[in-house]
Amino acid sequence: MMDVATLLSAVKRKERTDQYVILAALFALDAHITSVTAKQIVETLQLHLGADVPTNVNASLRAYKAYVSPTDKGPPIRWSLMPKGIEHLRSVSGLALSIASDAESYRSDVGIVCALVHPELAAVMKALGGVGAWVEVGDARHAHIYRETNLSIEGGAKLRIVATTATSMGLTAAAIATTQLVLQFRPRLVAMIGIAAGTRSGDKQFGDVLVADPSVDYNSGKVVFEGGIRGFQPDPYPIGLDPRLRTVLQKYGSTHPLFGEIRQRWKSAVPSKPNRLHVGPVGAADQVIDDATLILEIQKNGRKLIGVEMETYGVYRAVYEAPEPKPRVVSFKAVCDFAAEKSDSWQEYAAFMAAEFAVEFVRREWTALWPKSQ
């Protein structure tokens, strides 16, 4: 970390604008890693400038949209220093301003990736306070829109949550969205939240939550001709859950009471049988399946398959190959149909169940996953 005195002394007194001084304080406070309040900025500057601190720092921060971003609507509002702000400081000061700590630290707690704005992201935003609880953050040069909010967990701490959607359905778009999210916000946990097709085994209901462990790209392999017949030799590279995450999830097996609590919040029709959690292999590929025979083909190579969808493997693979500090990753997708038995009537309910369960799981189990992170 570079202190404020060094940043101030790098610029002649008459050339120190209020903007430079405030950005210098943000950098010294590591606001590019952890957001800070205007009060923290003022207190830091008072140590070096005494009574010459810029007036109305909050109003100034609102005017520096290219350089800073609000991460919490407050009160108090918390502010992050954006990459453009650091570049501006470098340009004015001539200092190198190393941000190696940025590559070595988490900057947020949960990064959420959805394939669809409706119904998936809409359900996530509603589960976390509604549209009014979120603010747009991030660099506008990127294709994705990022929204941020906070989640109060058991014990009283607040988590920084960042959510985005892929630009389209499918593995490639999901992998790109996840990679960009991880590189910009460095979350401790990446969660894919949405809807999926379930398999008929295991007495699944609409709204049952599927957690991919592992996620499998079932289209990975080799097409061959044997005896004049085209065949397929699968060569998947399954990616599973972090062992600690898997263990904590096991607490919600069978018909956990949480699912009944969530169902009571839904104001329309629900399935006749209770909803529950299924943890197991989920297949992923860039195709919508509307053919029962294809499900049977996939199950030949994965008899414990619990569902199929189009994005999770891209998310898992992006996290698997992410730089350190590497996040953990999980996918919560609820059953909206049964592949060949297509119906849109349960999509809203499935998105609701996936989002509500994911949020409750994080709220209740965060300290079990990261007991020393707060």
Regions found by a protein language model. Give the residues of each.
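Charged low-complexity interaction tracts in eukaryotic proteins
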Residues: 2-11, 50-51, 58-97
